[in-house]
Design a protein with these regions (language model features):
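Bacterial N-terminal signal peptides
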Residues: 3-16
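Electrostatic cytochrome c docking/interface patches
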Residues: 17-33, 46, 150-178, 191-192, ...
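The canonical Cys-X-X-Cys-His
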Residues: 28, 35-45, 91, 126, ...
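Hydrophobic, ordered structural segments
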Residues: 31, 83, 89, 93-174, ...
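Detector for the c-type heme attachment site
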Residues: 41-47, 96, 111, 131-132, ...
C-alpha cells in the first residue's frame, strides 16, 4: 500500500512538473524581456517612454559613429519592412554572426558577439518568440557604413554553451551576464575600446545620450573601487530596482530594472555569484 501511494505521488509530482514546464515561447519571452533587453534598441520611443503598440518595429534612437550610422531594425514579422521573409536560419545567423540574409554585416551596435554563447535551445526559443510578434509596418532607414568595423569577441563565449554548464551557478551567471551584454558597457576602457582581457568589469567609459552623461561603474570584486563590499541584496537591488548602494538612482543606460526585475531568483543569484568571481580592478 505504501509503495502504491509513493508511486502515485511520483506520478502526480511529475505531472505538475510537466504542467509547469517552460515552453519555447515562454523561454524566448523570458530571455528577450528579462535578460537581453531588446526593447532598448528595437522599440520606438515617445515622450512617455516606449511606444508599445509599435513594439520591436525599429528604434527611434540613432547611433552615429565614425564607422557607422544606424538605428535599431524592425524585427517584427512584417514582410516588407521587418524580418517576415527571413528563415529561422537567417534570424539565427543575424543573432550570433551579425550577418543579414543578403550577406551585409550588422554593426557592433547589435550585440551579436554576446549572443554566440546562446544554447541551441535558447536560440530556438528566441527565434520562436520573435516570430510570435504582431507584424508592424515601419520602414527604418538603412544603415550607413563608413569604415571597417571591428567586433571584439568575448572570452569564453565564442561558441554555444551546453545545458549541463547552466547547472553550475557561476557558469550560469556568466551566461546570463553575457547575453545581457553587461560588458558591452562595463568592459570598455575610458577611450571606448572594448577590452575584455585587461579591463573586464572595470568601467570608466563616459556615455552621453538624451539622459545626459554617465560613467560606467566598476563592477569587479574590488572592495573599494568595485562592488566587492556590496552585499548580495545590494547588488540585486541595483539590478532589479535601479538603486545604487548609497541610495542613488542609477542613470541610463544602466537603469534596466524594467527588465532585470523580471528575472527569477535563481538567475539573480547566479549573476551575483558570477560577479563575485571578477578579478578586482581599479
Amino acid at each position: 500500500m505504501v509503495q502504491l501511494v509513493t508511486a502515485w505521488l511520483a506520478v502526480l509530482i511529475a505531472a505538475v512538473g510537466i504542467a509547469h514546464a517552460e515552453t519555447p515561447l515562454e523561454r524566448g519571452s523570458y530571455l528577450v524581456n528579462a535578460v537581453m533587453a531588446c526593447d532598448g534598441c528595437h522599440t520606438p520611443r515617445g515622450p512617455s517612454g516606449f511606444i508599445m503598440d509599435k513594439r520591436f518595429s525599429g528604434g527611434s534612437q540613432i547611433w552615429d559613429t565614425s564607422a557607422y550610422t544606424v538605428r535599431g531594425s524592425n524585427i517584427t514579422p512584417d514582410r516588407e519592412t521587418g524580418i517576415g521573409t527571413w528563415s529561422e536560419a537567417d534570424i539565427k545567423r543575424s543573432l550570433t554572426d551579425g550577418v543579414r540574409p543578403n550577406g551585409t554585416p550588422l554593426s557592433p551596435q547589435m550585440p551579436f558577439a554576446f549572443y554566440k554563447i546562446l544554447t541551441p535551445r535558447d536560440l530556438d526559443a528566441v527565434v520562436a518568440y520573435l516570430r510570435s510578434f504582431a507584424p508592424v509596418r515601419n520602414e527604418v532607414p538603412p544603415p550607413v557604413y563608413k569604415a571597417a568595423m571591428h567586433v571584439e569577441l568575448v572570452p569564453g563565449a565564442v561558441k554555444p554553451f551546453t545545458e549541463d554548464a547552466l547547472n553550475n551557478p557561476v557558469k550560469r551567471g556568466f551566461y546570463l551576464g553575457t547575453i545581457a551584454h553587461c560588458m558591452e558597457c562595463h568592459g570598455r576602457r575610458a577611450d571606448g575600446v572594448a577590452d575584455y582581457k585587461t579591463a573586464l568589469g572595470k568601467g570608466g567609459y563616459l556615455f552621453k545620450g538624451p539622459w545626459g552623461a554617465a560613467v560606467t561603474s566598476n563592477i569587479t570584486s574590488h572592495p573599494k573601487r568595485g562592488i566587492g563590499a556590496w552585499t548580495d541584496a545590494e547588488i540585486k537591488r541595483a539590478l532589479t530596482q535601479g538603486v545604487s548602494r548609497d541610495g542613488r538612482a542609477l542613470q541610463q543606460p544602466m537603469a534596466r530594472q524594467n527588465y532585470f526585475s523580471r528575472m527569477t531568483g535563481a538567475d539573480l543569484d547566479a549573476i551575483v555569484a558570477w560577479l563575485r568571481t571578477l578579478p578586482p580592478l581599479e
